[in-house]
Each structure stands twice: as structure tokens, then as C-alpha cells.
């Protein structure tokens, strides 16, 4: 895993704890989790293509 072991992860966690504080960690974790969930959802869903004609095109034809 990129040469990062448990000691390095603990140091990173402590630094994040010092920077953001204990109160904000759940907010940051929740936001990160939602972002990952939305990214996975966006990559697995097929793209929706809008096939309805636009209203501008109708007005130009008249």
C-alpha cells in the first residue's frame, strides 16, 4: 500500500487530529465518505442523455 505502514498511518492521523481538532473529525470523515459514495455511484451509473428538444430551437424555427 504505497509503502505506508501502521506507524505512518498513526502519525498522519495524529497530525490530522492536531490540525482539525477532535470535534471536526466526524464531519470530515462523513463528508469524505459521502464524496466516495457519490463518486462510485457516478462511475457505475450509465450516463443519462437528454433527447428532448430545447425550447430555444423551437422558437428559432418559428
UniProtKB/Swiss-Prot annotation:
Transmembrane segments: 1-21
Top-level taxon in the UniProt lineage: Bacteria
Location in or out of the cell: Cell inner membrane
The UniProt record lists the keyword Cell membrane: yes
Assigned keywords, A-Z: Cell inner membrane, Cell membrane, Membrane, Protein transport, Translocation, Transmembrane, Transmembrane helix, Transport
Gene Ontology biological-process annotations: protein transport by the Tat complex
Location (main, coarse): membrane
Database matches in Pfam families: TatA_B_E
GO cellular component, as recorded: TAT protein transport complex
InterPro entries linked to this entry: TatA/B/E, TatA/E
Membrane-related topology note: Single-pass membrane protein
Gene Ontology molecular function: any one: protein transmembrane transporter activity
Described function: Part of the twin-arginine translocation (Tat) system that transports large folded proteins containing a characteristic twin-arginine motif in their signal peptide across membranes. TatA could form the protein-conducting channel of the Tat system.
Family per similarity comment: Belongs to the TatA/E family.
Assembly behavior: The Tat system comprises two distinct complexes: a TatABC complex, containing multiple copies of TatA, TatB and TatC subunits, and a separate TatA complex, containing only TatA subunits. Substrates initially bind to the TatABC complex, which probably triggers association of the separate TatA complex to form the active translocon.
Protein name: Sec-independent protein translocase protein TatA
The organism of origin for this protein: Oleidesulfovibrio alaskensis (strain ATCC BAA-1058 / DSM 17464 / G20) (Desulfovibrio alaskensis)
Gene name as annotated: tatA
